[in-house]
């Protein structure tokens, strides 16, 4: 989201994305990978923090240790343990070992060594996720609880420096960092963000020249789709409905879940409601972000699981009758929680209409909540149906499939399947770690289980409809971790 985007404006990690989304060096000038794939050695370039301190390997050690320290309860600590497989990360998070046992070592000021439990094919792509960014320990200790809350408590090592920001403000500014190691190739003098909640006001601000880039909603697309400054870019997010399989007995019935997913017309949702370039999705992993050993997109074929979830009123009716018989009920009523934002509310209304029309006797009641509350309710299991989304944190299908492992914090409905868990374990810590082709095939098998049991009802892959000034060039749009990067951007007078 935008918060990660801004953090990356003023902070560099070890690696960054090139224009095509591939991992290339940032603060790590070079790196070595051991023959067994379990040791990464990063050699840092000469770089400075905005207070003049050198960026050192110790800054990464401190930042990573903070991320796994159970006292900090970081929501992204799993990026080092489950995802990154950094030695001892899981044990530290569980409180079984001290943070000093984390498998990351400052060999010297310019050399960082990372030890992994198993080979992780996508490890380099994790390095541009903000959880893996460095933190200057001495500076942090002068800020403590206020760290990151104002320009005075933010330290930059990236292309830009935070110069104006207040937590409750509607605008914040960054200026070019003259000490950035690649400052000669940064064309922009700075970035000025405005928080504008009214999308029509934002569009008007763009049209008057007050903004160079803004997001659009579906209704606005019709107004501007012929404007050469209009673009639609993949955002990487999969929007889906999560049924609470554990807490709602009716939703524990697989046939009822199948009836519901077959009742959803995704083409109508994207074509008639969103109209922003978002595409129907019939997979649990959206397309255009994960490439396999053979160079192909993991989810390029959107027909492979169509028989498990594509709109089919006849199939929906058939599964519905079976479910009613099994449950001994002719009617059902479910509450669905949805974000208090424009697009999710419109999508939820159409989902409600489709389910109620195709499955007579089934009622969906919509409860609109602020996003933060909706997420909290789903994490707490305080929901029946939830309209939610997930974006890829790194360039591998596991960023989605890992969510459905028993006990994962994002497995909101508490679904559990031993075969699925076993496949994911083999792909994460087992023999398949060293068999890229076998691992890829196994991930397809895992995805099939999720869809065939209707663990989620995938809806669409999100695109962002945006206006970007014709005077601006070089903005990189990515579906993974950071949606927009401005290092190569320029603005003509």
Language-model region placement:
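Aromatic- and charge-enriched surface segment that lines or borders ligand/interaction sites
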Residues: 29-79, 113, 250-252
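Gly/Pro-rich hinge or "lid" segments in bacterial periplasmic/extracellular proteins
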Residues: 116-186, 190
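Extracytoplasmic/peripheral linker and loop segments enriched in polar/acidic and small residues
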Residues: 98, 270, 307-309, 361-374, ...
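N-terminal lobe/hinge region of extracytoplasmic solute-binding protein
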Residues: 1-35, 155
């Amino acid at each position: 989201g935008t918060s990660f985007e801004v953090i990356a404006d003023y902070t560099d990690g070890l690696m960054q994305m090139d224009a095509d989304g591939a991992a290339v060096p940032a603060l790590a000038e070079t790196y070595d990978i051991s023959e067994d794939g379990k040791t990464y050695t990063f050699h840092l370039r000469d770089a400075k923090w905005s207070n003049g301190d050198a960026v050192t390997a110790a800054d990464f050690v401190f930042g990573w240790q903070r991320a796994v320290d159970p006292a900090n309860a970081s929501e992204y600590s799993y990026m080092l343990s489950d995802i990154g497989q950094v030695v001892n990360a899981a044990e530290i998070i569980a409180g079984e070992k001290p943070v000093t046992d984390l498998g990351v070592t400052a060999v010297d000021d310019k050399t960082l060594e990372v030890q992994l439990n198993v080979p992780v094919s996508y490890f380099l792509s994790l390095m541009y996720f903000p959880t893996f960014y460095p933190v200057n320990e001495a500076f942090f200790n002068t800020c403590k609880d206020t760290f990151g809350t104002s320009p005075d408590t933010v330290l930059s090592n990236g292309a830009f420096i935070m110069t104006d920001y207040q937590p409750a403000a509607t605008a914040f500014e960054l200026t070019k960092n003259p000490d950035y190691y690649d400052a000669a190739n940064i064309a922009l003098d700075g970035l000025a963000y405005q928080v504008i909640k009214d999308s029509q006001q934002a569009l008007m601000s763009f049209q008057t020249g007050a903004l160079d880039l803004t997001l659009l909603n579906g209704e606005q697309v019709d107004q501007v789709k012929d404007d050469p400054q209009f673009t639609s870019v993949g955002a990487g997010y999969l929007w889906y409905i999560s049924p609470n399989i554990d807490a709602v007995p009716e939703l524990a019935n697989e046939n009822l879940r199948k009836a519901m997913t077959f009742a959803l017309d995704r083409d109508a949702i994207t074509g008639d409601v969103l109209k922003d370039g978002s595409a129907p999705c019939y997979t649990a992993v959206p397309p255009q972000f994960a490439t396999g050993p053979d160079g192909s997109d993991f989810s390029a074929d959107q027909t492979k699981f169509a028989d498990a979830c594509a709109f089919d009123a006849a199939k929906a009716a058939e599964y519905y009758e079976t479910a009613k018989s099994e449950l001994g009920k002719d009617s059902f009523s479910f509450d669905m929680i949805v974000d208090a934002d424009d697009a999710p509310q419109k999508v939820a209304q159409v989902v409600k209409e489709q389910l109620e029309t195709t499955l007579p006797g089934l009622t969906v009641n919509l409860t609109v909540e602020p996003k933060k509350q909706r997420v909290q309710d789903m994490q707490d299991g305080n929901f029946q149906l939830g309209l939610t989304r997930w974006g890829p944190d790194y360039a591998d299908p596991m960023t989605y499939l890992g969510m459905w492992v028993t006990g994962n914090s994002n497995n909101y409905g508490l679904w559990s399947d031993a075969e699925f868990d076993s496949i994911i374990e083999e792909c994460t810590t087992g023999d398949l770690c060293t068999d890229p082709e076998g691992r890829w095939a196994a991930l397809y098998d895992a995805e099939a289980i999720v869809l065939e049991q209707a663990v989620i009802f995938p809806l669409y892959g999100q695109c962002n409809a945006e206006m970007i000034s014709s005077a601006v060039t070089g903005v990189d749009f990515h579906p993974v971790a950071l949606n927009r990067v401005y290092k190569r951007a320029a603005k003509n007078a």
